[in-house]
Amino acid sequence: YCMMDGTFQNTKLFKGEYNVRIDGPFIPLVRENTDGTLLHDGSVNTEISGTTKVKFEVQPFLNVEFVGDPQVSNGVIKAQVRVTRGVSDEVFREKIQPMGNWKDEYLNVTDIQFFVSYSNTVGYRARDERWSSSISYEGKSFEDLLGKEVIVQSNGSIPSGRKVFVRAAARINYDTPVGSGTRRWNYSEPVEVLIP
């Protein structure tokens, strides 16, 4: 199963020849048009026997990073986050539009999440909902904020003496795999925060 460091482990596979493909918040490695015609195949055919390493180079939709260190005041964590495009609008359109059903709103950044957790694997599936927060954006309203610092902060008051981990995430209005209804986040690195 997928690990937070991007590796995948499944110990229940039989020895044999496999076609390996991945989906995530990046330009799809396998692209087909609406009638099923293959446009690009970045999957890998490989023999799996024991531990097998397969490396995929991907083009993320977004890059998310903290600017400076998160600050704590009265149990509330504030941080500055910068979101930039991982690929230009032109490259995104060039690779996605031929797949069909193109919509300009695919490029829209829809939300920024600020995940807080006791776990160093902090993220959507490992977050404390009491303290995690989100900011939603409609239409193209985030466009002017690309490359600029956005302030995020935790909800509630985290008790003194706790050690938590924070991570920011952002996503665009595009499903991966196409038509799945799943819009995936691009994440920052996790950061440890001590609550004084």
Place the predicted regions along the sequence by residue:
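Structured interaction patches on ligand/partner-binding surfaces of diverse proteins
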Residues: 26-55
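Short beta-strand elements
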Residues: 175-196
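A short, solvent-exposed beta-strand micro-motif common in secreted/extracellular proteins
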Residues: 6, 16-34
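Short, surface-exposed beta-strand/beta-hairpin micro-motifs centered on an aromatic residue
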Residues: 3-12
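Beta-strand-rich modules
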Residues: 15, 19-20, 147-149, 154-180
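Structural beta-strand segments of beta-rich domains
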Residues: 75-79
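Short amphipathic, basic-aromatic surface patches that mediate peripheral association
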Residues: 82-104
